[in-house]
Amino acid sequence: MTPIRARYLSVVLVAAAVGFASGSASAALAQGMPTTGPDVTVVDIYDIDSYGGANGFHGYAVGTTSCNIGDDELNWCNTGSCGGGLSSKQHPVIAQNLYRLKAGRFEQIGMSWLKHGFFATNKGNAQTCKVGTSCITPPLGFQQLGIGCTDTYWAGLNGDQPLGPRSEVNATTSNFIFPYTNVGFSQVYDQRVKVADADVDPAQNAGALYWVEGQYVSDNDAAAGNGLNNASYRKATVSPGTFALNMEPDNPPGYFATVREHSAIHAWPAIDPAVELFYVDVPGAVIERFEVARKVTAVDGDTWHYEYAIHNVNSDRSARAFSVDFADPTPISAAGFHDIDSHSGEPYSTADWTPVATPGTGTVSWSTSTFASDPNANALRWATLYSFWFDADAPPSTAVQTIELFKPGSPTAVTFTFPLFSDGFQSHNLTAWSAAVP
């Protein structure tokens, strides 16, 4: 597989009396560590279907091969007659996304609704699934994904309309409504990975790089605490004229273009070692994770340009605000925001978060409505990524970041710094911190 560059830190946050959380850096998380219980991940982005376009948008779907790398069977029931006491709600759902890196900014530009799993084929592939383990046929057959077994949903399946709304799924626990609500569809992009033509047109995106991503959410995987490695990504290209998406090939032999057990935000530091990537975990019965990537560039001797991308991995509580606070009342300017709009009948607002940089405070913030005022506000929900940027007359060593959570609970917010690069690394010499992750 492709080596991931840069160091990844995990922050475990403990609620303080004021409702905020604080934390410290712990050891980097290593891919492929042994897990207890069922553990589903995407071992291969299998294929991509391009459905054409209309009204300035194109529709796509991503094929995914899943694998149970854990030590127990994964539930895969979506009928009322499953054995083992399983209910029809105990099956995975599959989300698909598209991301772009353009001119130093990492953004999500496409998202799908959800494919509900209906049948596990339980194929064996020791090379691409659980190395050294053959597929163990599960007791309930196709109603489970066995240990070391794979199952492929090609793009045509994952893009087969109708799909299920994301709004009906709690990604932290994998509790969801089933049968899902069928709202109907009329366009080729409805419920699929919907992307604006302007975001993929090669003529308008010179030098841009693209990645597709697949993520599974499953009930007994989440209950076992294994829901943080369920996404994988793969580089893609866009064909001029047709805007068809194409996968990066598995070439040379032994090289796997799909990067396993990491969400697509990891592609940014893999491409650019000046990017810092930080895990922010919200404590609870099941950990809820945000991944925060940051790149700071010295514009001149007194001004720095800041680029942030925040990815919600599995947090049902979601986020409603993000702020960066500097120690001094530094001037802040040129603040901006990019999100990914819900579509095809989801109930959520698509109103942008407006940046606010109050003079004399040294703070810039973005926010949407509170949950109490609008439960369908444009919160940063699971499997989505929002981007933020600004200029400041202050180095990154003085920046303190805060994510305010959307749904009620404790803590109400998480506050963190980037300790690994707290000296700013104005020289951009990050060689000492660049390493392959196993």
Q: For the regions a protein language model found, what residue spans apply to each?
A:
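Extracellular adhesion/glycan-binding regions together with long Ser/Thr-
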Residues: 176-181, 345-385
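Low-complexity, intrinsically disordered segments enriched in Ser/Thr together with acidic residues
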Residues: 183-204, 367-398
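Low-complexity, acidic Ser/Thr/Pro/Gly-rich terminal tails and inter-domain linkers that flank the onset
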Residues: 250-301
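Bacterial N-terminal signal peptides
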Residues: 10-24
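Solvent-exposed beta-hairpin/edge-strand motifs
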Residues: 321-350
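Short beta-strand elements of extracellular/lumenal beta-sandwich folds
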Residues: 294, 298-316
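Boundary/junction segments of secreted and surface-exposed precursor proteins
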Residues: 20-61, 211, 228-266, 419-438
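Solvent-exposed N-terminal domain segments of exported/luminal and surface proteins
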Residues: 36-239
